[in-house]
Amino acid sequence: MNKNIILVCLIFSFLQGRGQYPGYALSDHPDAFKKSFAGATAATESIQSDFSQEKSLTMLSEKINSTGKFWYRRKDKLRLEYVRPYAYVMILNSGKILIREGQKENTISANSNKVFQQVNRILIDCVSGTMLDNPDFQSRVFESAGSFLIELKPLAKNLKELYRNINIVIDKKDYTAVAIEMFELSGDTTIIRFQNKQLNAQIPDSVFRIP
């Protein structure tokens, strides 16, 4: 009887690892991935790309779609600029966060607010390859033919109150993020997909300037 229970549990665990994300299986070599990922990101000085965002809200039947531009420069400079359907800019630079919406600007110190500090780290971790070392999350690595999927489950209390999990999809060719998927406890989801990536191009300081 006990053997049958153990067998059922093992089968369930195996199926859960394979079926949770269609097309992906739990990686047998997460340490090898981590080493390759760290090596590739260490050689990446900058990234710029277009992005599209798809947001699904439990209160709305239609999805909200946005597009924009993305810039990152090693190791703590990032700009996310929404172009359509509205203008919105977020800049992270050396512990400061600037948010510009229309004519309104607001500058925040990430260190003065625990949530902003964690959000700042999440965004930087996603593009710099350090998310597997973030103590605020428990991670698992899944693998498909063309990409890896890093599943991050929040451990920090305030993040657990917001997110069920955050997934980062990594391209096997260059080990850069293809997509960031955020699943909130409320049932809302946000998926950001990156296209037309350019690696190690010169990005002027003005892109990340915070007055």
Predicted regions and their residues:
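Positively charged n-region of N-terminal signal peptides that target proteins for export
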Residues: 1-4
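Hydrophobic h-region of N-terminal signal peptides that target proteins for export
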Residues: 9-18
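N-terminal leader/targeting segments and the immediate start of mature chains
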Residues: 18-52, 56-61, 206-211
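Gly/Pro-enriched, hydrophobic low-complexity segments
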Residues: 19, 108, 132-211
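Short, solvent-exposed helix-to-loop capping segments enriched in aromatics
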Residues: 41, 118-131
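Short hydrophobic/aromatic-rich beta-strand segments that constitute the beta-sheet cores
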Residues: 51, 78-82, 97-100, 150-152, ...
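Short, surface-exposed charged micro-motifs
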Residues: 67-69, 79, 87-89, 138-140, ...
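An acidic-aromatic
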Residues: 69-118, 190
